[in-house]
Design a protein with these regions (language model features):
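Pyridoxal 5′-phosphate
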Residues: 1-405
Length: 405
């Protein structure tokens, strides 16, 4: 088997390359709009036009008003602002209880932990074995002092999509604010804040072929989480700091492109996803898919290969020119098992052998087939050298022999 001549990038959940049209508008903003968008003269007005245009594009993509879009430095900042800002606002009403899931992104998990250290209480909802949050479990956890429910729209590791509209309706029935981390969803599947019924929604530009270091928080009119960054009057006095004009322009353009061709993109990515899942589960013994298929991001594949370490597979794939991951890029330096996989009941030893492959619009069926070719060669070869795999096979044979006696 020969390596492909180009790098095969299959880690689109970690980040994506800027689209050419995005780079073009960013260069235009950087070179032609040198003023401060808060300044009241012509050069400042030119910069503000880029900010206003980007805000309008983001708002249109999720069916919001431009006045409901607040730009941040990243998706993690948007998550921190939604969670901590809501907690601090509601604490003034003696509401110091929050609800989230046990498999959120670390931006949510660590924000919740920080609030717990300040005396807040947090309930962590356990997902089902297929990776879904049951709305009835959320309702059962709501208390009179509940300030916020924060459940991610789509999981960043296993790609499962949550029933956010049902959960939001339950939260509102009890007078509770609802936030969703939609960083993996925006630009990948349809996102309509009115249909979802959420009060706050986080997004990140580099997940949909926009620039890194650029995010946004949607806040429904009348919902104001307390500021985390104080200073000037930018972002309607809710998030201080001179705006990243080029970043905002790039984010708006990227989301406009992503949502314009969303149906085609989803169908294409799902075709690649399903091909890889079907072929790997058929041809590699004991490979297991993590997360359900019915409500799953179209480009997400997360598969465990028992008897191996994910880092070993990762190195082999890299030698064949394939970029993938063992889980969230935000936690890639840790050798601890994925909290996402543990939360859905994947045993620790199997979770260590999990790989995430995430497709984007630029990927091809040729690349999907090449990935399967490489895995079908690498996994058996590595297992033949794996003490963990061989010991497991010996135990299985011994159990089988005992059953025949």
């Amino acid at each position: 088997m020969e390596n492909m001549e180009k790098v095969v990038y299959l880690d689109n959940a970690a980040t994506t390359a800027c689209a050419p049209e995005v780079l073009a508008v960013m260069v235009e903003a950087l070179s032609g709009a040198c003023g401060n968008p808060s300044s009241h003269y012509s050069v400042g007005y030119e910069a503000k036009e880029f900010v206003d245009a980007g805000r309008a594009q983001v708002a249109k993509a999720i069916n919001a008003s431009p006045a409901e879009i607040f730009f941040t430095g990243c998706g993690s900042e948007a998550d921190n602002w939604a969670v901590k800002g809501s907690a601090f606002t509601k604490a003034r009403q003696n509401k110091k209880h929050l609800i989230t899931s046990a498999f959120e992104h670390h931006a949510i998990m660590h924000s919740m932990a920080a609030l717990e250290r300040l005396g807040f209480e947090v309930t962590y909802i356990k997902p089902t074995a297929e990776g879904y949050i049951r709305p009835e479990d959320v309702e059962a956890a709501i208390r009179p002092d509940t300030a916020l429910v924060s459940i991610m729209m789509a999981n960043n590791e296993i790609g499962t999509i949550q029933p956010i509209n049902e959960i939001a309706a339950i939260a509102h029935k009890h007078g509770v604010w609802m936030h969703t981390d939609a960083v993996q969803a925006v630009g990948a599947i349809p996102v309509d804040v009115k249909e979802l019924g959420v009060d706050m929604l986080s997004m990140s530009a580099h997940k949909f072929n926009g620039p890194k270091g650029m995010g946004a928080l949607y806040c429904k009119k009348g919902v104001w989480p307390q500021n985390l960054i104080d200073g000037g009057s930018q972002e309607a006095r809710h998030r201080a700091g001179t705006e990243n004009v080029a970043g905002i322009a790039g984010m708006g353009k990227a989301l406009e492109i992503a949502t314009t061709h969303l149906g085609e993109r989803m169908a294409h990515e799902q075709q690649l996803r399903d091909y890889v899942i079907d072929r790997i589960l058929k041809n590699i013994p004991e490979a297991r898919l993590n997360g359900g298929v019915e409500h799953r991001l179209p480009g997400n594949v997360n598969i465990s290969f028992p008897g191996l370490e994910g880092e070993t597979i990762l190195l082999d794939l890299d030698m064949h020119g394939i970029c993938a991951s063992t889980g969230s890029a935000c936690n890639s330096d840790s050798l601890d098992p994925s909290h996402v996989l543990l939360s859905i009941g994947v045993p620790e030893e199997i979770g260590h052998g999990s790989m995430r492959f995430t497709f984007g619009p630029q990927n091809t069926m040729e690349e999907a087939k090449y990935l399967c070719d490489v895995l079908e060669e690498v996994i058996p070869r590595r297992r033949a050298m794996s003490c963990m795999w061989l010991q497991g096979q010996n135990k299985a044979r011994q159990f089988s022999l005992k059953g025949e006696q």
